[in-house]
Amino acid sequence: SITDGQIFLDTDIFNSGIRPAVDVGISVSRVGGNAQIKAMKSIAGMLRLDLAQFRELEAFAKFGSDLDETTQKQLTRGRIMVEILKQNQYAPMPIEKQVVIIYAGLNGYLDATELDKVTIFETELLEYIAVNQSAIFDEIKNSGKLEEKNEGNLKGILDEFVKTFNA
């Protein structure tokens, strides 16, 4: 609908294995922010712009061979975020788990993770939190927010988990 926005799907994105194959650079939404819980809004506010910039940078990088370290890091983070956002058919993820995974990706906790291990990282991280700190999931789910105290706890958990995962 013209009043709510449009989602544009891209065959190149689809053919590269990314599902859903949404082109964030040209898709428009007026309701997206209103449909999100506060925790998601606070952590993913710049995600759409970051992904659009990543797509442009990735296209540019195909033509150049000498990329500086900052550009390489942006490309790596972008690829990780794309991997994080992939979704298997009939496999929805609860919002509290989405918040944790997107938070981890946007804040660099997966930067040292190889691209083919991102899914394993996600699975093991969510299991680790469910066993050791499930209260974070409950708080996000029940309040819809990622309070400062819980964000601090989440950072600590992520720091611990990354050390064991990358060991």
Language-model segment annotations:
Residues 1-167:
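Conserved catalytic/coupling modules of large nucleotide/cofactor-utilizing molecular machines
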